[in-house]
Regions:
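C-terminal substrate-binding/catalytic lobe of Rossmann-fold NAD(P)-dependent oxidoreductases
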Residues: 1-112
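NAD(P)-dependent Rossmann-like dehydrogenase/reductase catalytic/cofactor-binding core
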Residues: 91-140
Length: 140
């Protein structure tokens, strides 16, 4: 796979899926992932497929839940959009992840596919800043 990175999509491994189980132990051995290295400067895209226990899901219902979270308790961390955007539109976005509502799919009654964009440099840096603020607020 050692070819021109600026002209190819390169499948590779990622530790991100396994790292999630360190934060959410209930997900251990329940998820995995891979990465596609693409010739873009900074923005990445999560393609997440979830087999849920809940039946009767709709794309509208899934999107409504993400939108409510993005407008409510996760405001500034999670985003939601129904605009037809591309990777460069998310460059410099401070939110950790922005759900692409136009791409949400429900397969059958219980399988959901979600696409969510993130600026893998700036969004992460903003969360580190949030952590520093939190630690400072506790006097640590």
């Amino acid at each position: 796979r050692a070819r021109a990175a600026a002209m190819n999509i390169i499948p590779t491994t990622t530790g991100a899926a396994k790292a999630i189980s360190l934060v959410i132990p209930a997900l251990k051995d329940k998820m995995d992932g891979l990465a596609l290295r693409v010739p873009t400067a900074t923005v990445s895209l999560v393609d997440l497929v979830i087999d849920t226990e809940k039946k009767g899901l709709t794309a509208e219902g899934v999107n409504a839940a993400f939108k409510a979270a993005a407008d409510g308790p996760m405001k500034g961390i999670l985003g939601y959009t129904e605009e037809k955007l591309v990777s460069l539109d998310f460059r410099g976005d401070a939110r950790s992840s922005i759900v692409d509502g136009l791409s949400t799919l429900v397969l059958g009654e219980d399988m959901v596919k979600i696409l969510s964009w993130y600026d893998n440099e700036w969004g992460y840096s903003c969360r580190v800043g949030d952590l520093i603020d939190f630690i400072a607020s506790k006097g640590l």
